[in-house]
Amino acid sequence: MNHAFIQSAPQNTTFDQCIKCTVCTVYCPVAKANPNYPGPKQCGPDGERLRIKSAEYYDDALKLCTNCKRCETACPSGVKIGDMIAVARGKYGKKPLNPKLVRDFVLSHTDFFGSIATPFAPLVNAATSLPLVKKLMHKTIGVHDHKTLPKYSHGTFRRWFKQNCTSQPLYQRQVAYFHGCYVNYNHPQLGKDFVRVMNAMNIGVRLLDSEKCCGVPLIANGFHSKARKNALHNVKHLTAMVNDYHAPVLSTSSTCSFTLQQEYPHVLGVDNSQVVDQIHYVTRFLLKEFMSGNAPKMKPVHKKVVYHTPCHLERSGNVMFTIELLKMIPGLELVVLDSECCGLAGTYGFKEENYEVSKKIGSHLFDAIQTSDADYAVTDCETCKWQIEENAHLETIHPVSLLAMALIDEPRA
């Protein structure tokens, strides 16, 4: 039991609003794919009524939840089902000392391992791609050997920004960029595309003086106390940025922005009220700028793309901003997929006990993409990108990178 987290965890009493319609269970991707999962109604409001009486009613079946929040999206009564489950796992979930604890630590502490791996990225990437290493990780710590581990960049985005973006403060308008772990350690090109798009709109980019992982992989793997420390750190630096520069804070990760806005107060008990209204997912900001007349010059992009909606973007209500933004790219043929969860759910699908369920959840999406005859898949979430590329075998790009592809002007950053 996590006694430190219990002291700060928020108390969720929205279970009283549950009308027992079970629409959450119908909408849950795990309940459809795994008969061992009781479903969000039983794990959430039904279970919470018992857990507030005694911790002995905690059930390890809660670990089967992906934290996709689709149950909350579906709930007609506004019950915070996913939050209940996440908080319960943080409060009562046991973490016995065994090899899977090592796996969960490695998968969730992205800053620690990213900072170690990026200087040696070619070696690390080569090693983790070896079948022998994959088999060893499967047998020892339980990372499924059929999964392709994310590749690290040889050098971080923050390092590139420091070396190449000294002119950013010269722009009259400024935005702050919460780049997250994925851009910093795995795919700096997305951050570079973000800077290029902003500069094409005559907007400069600033980074926080310091940022840590948003905390979502820590929450998912039961390290709630560490996630809360990260949240307090980030809120401190977000507040300083907003107060000093009056700049909106943008994220290119649908999960990072959702976590900064929603998970901090509702799951971790961290007050973000001073900055939450200034935090935006990037496509929301971009569409507003485009519609107000501040759109960059773009050339036609004669490509067919299929768009997959990430679960956290749907939960945050920002889906239409991305779709409408993509429609503004000239020449682009856009197909919006009728897809649900991709199944990876951050670190969930990397675990050997979840691998088959993860693939089953995403099978409809993979089939739709493979039969689409598209040039690219587009999604706002990095882990959706990994899952699609691995299982549907189609290059998957971010909406911001697609915009950068359409820009006429050369990058100025």
Per-segment meaning from a language model:
Residues 1-9, 36-56, 317-325:
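Short, charged low-complexity linear segments at domain edges
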Residues 2-15, 51-62, 199-201, 328-331:
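Short, intrinsically disordered, charge-biased short linear motifs at domain edges
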Residues 6-7, 81-413:
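Iron-sulfur cluster-binding electron-transfer modules in prokaryotic oxidoreductases
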Residues 12-31, 57-79, 114, 185, ...:
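Cysteine-centered iron-sulfur cluster-binding motifs in ferredoxin-type domains/subunits
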Residues 23-48, 64-92, 259, 381-383, ...:
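Iron-sulfur cluster-binding cysteine motifs and their immediate structural context
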Residues 52-56, 70, 105-109:
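A ubiquitous short alpha-helical element
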